[in-house]
Amino acid sequence: SSAASDVYKRQYAQYVIPVNAKNYPIILWHGIGQSGRSFETTPDGREGFQTLLPRDGWATYIVDQPRRGRAGRTEATEAKSEIPTVTSEAGVWNAFRLGRWVPPKPATANPNMQMLLDGETINQFMRMQTPDTGALPPTEAYGWKLGEAMRDLLKRTGPAVVGTHSYAGQIGWYGAMKSPDLVKAVVTYEPGQVVYPEGEKVKEMNSEIPLVQQRLNPVRVSKQEFLKLTKMPIFIIFGDNISTKSS
């Protein structure tokens, strides 16, 4: 449809290229309900990857994915959101594992948080959330479109290391399979979905939340596509305060 065909044309990227930059730039894709703003500074005022990486010699590109933030221009007529992190502040609090918040009860915080949880920090954190301007279909066709968007950027940057967070994990997989000649490595923070070859069995994972259940299902691709990922370095990082029981 026309609403889907324009998706790869509308992404946004900002960049900082230091003098005598290292061989490969780093491209950063934000998570769900977020924009590239999340890589600029932390909510409590500390430096983000936007300045930390260039200071260490890395050319750094920060993306706003299509239909989000500064890439919000779309031909889609609907503004549908199925994502908890863009429907309520409590959903954001829980999804980012700051603690537990089930209104009307007050929010509680997880212990040993590195991020300050004072009023102004929380205010800034919530202001980083931004809605979608069109549907983000959880389909293979849409995933490949986002992979094309990454390839369009890679054609301009040259070979690069791709860094993704949460929902953008799938963009990293599709992008790497779309451009194995240009993606030199993938670094992904808590990827929202994983990739498996068609026909390979995986342990069933269940959730009472329909969206989570949907995202727990792996992205299925041909073995030929999957093998492309096995030929590049991949670093997967998970954080703390991950629940070990159903909630």
Each model region followed by its residue ranges:
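Active-site glycine-rich loops that stabilize anionic/oxyanionic intermediates
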Residues: 30-35, 39-40
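Conserved alpha/beta-hydrolase
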Residues: 46-70
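Conserved acidic catalytic loop of the alpha/beta-hydrolase fold
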Residues: 143-160
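Gly/Ala-rich beta-loop-alpha elbow adjacent to hydrolase catalytic centers
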Residues: 163-172
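The feature captures the conserved acid-bearing segment of alpha/beta-hydrolase catalytic domains
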Residues: 193, 198-247
